[in-house]
Amino acid sequence: MTALTQAHCEACRADAPHVSDEELPVLLRQIPDWNIEVRDGIMQLEKVYLFKNFRHALAFTNAIGEISEAEGHHPGLLTEWGKVTVTWWSHSIKGLHRNDFIMAARTDEVAKTAEGRK
């Protein structure tokens, strides 16, 4: 468990700061299995989780939906047979905010107990 899993998201307005170049490697070390993807010039955190079937993948997707609603911060979710791709970024600032790292860490926590993981 990391400090990120214990933190809560804060409201993120359009003028909120992006994660700084100094903060980025420190935060990434706390979520080592996540990748940074850049789409349309926007940095995003992304990770693929594998499952034994669609039912387990869908249950995981719904669990991520629950924690997202609780924190008011929502990912991109692609649910396929045996696979869920989770992508975190802050839409309002078009990039990465500390909230994204908090939710990536929380996603990993949910995955630890998710049924049907490969």
Swiss-Prot record:
InterPro entries found in the cross-reference section: PCD_sf, Pterin-4-alpha-carb_dehyd, Pterin_deHydtase
Record's keyword terms, sorted: Lyase
CDD domains: PCD_DCoH_subfamily_a
E.C. numbers: 4.2.1.96
GO molecular function, one term: 4-alpha-hydroxytetrahydrobiopterin dehydratase activity
Catalytic activity reported: (4aS,6R)-4a-hydroxy-L-erythro-5,6,7,8-tetrahydrobiopterin = (6R)-L-erythro-6,7-dihydrobiopterin + H2O
Domain of life: Bacteria
Cross-referenced SUPFAM superfamilies: PCD-like
Pfam family, one: Pterin_4a
Listed GO biological process terms: tetrahydrobiopterin biosynthetic process
HAMAP family associated with the record: Pterin_4_alpha (MF_00434)
Family: Belongs to the pterin-4-alpha-carbinolamine dehydratase family.
Protein name: Putative pterin-4-alpha-carbinolamine dehydratase
Organism annotation: Pseudomonas paraeruginosa (strain DSM 24068 / PA7)
Lineage of origin: Bacteria, Pseudomonadati, Pseudomonadota, Gammaproteobacteria, Pseudomonadales
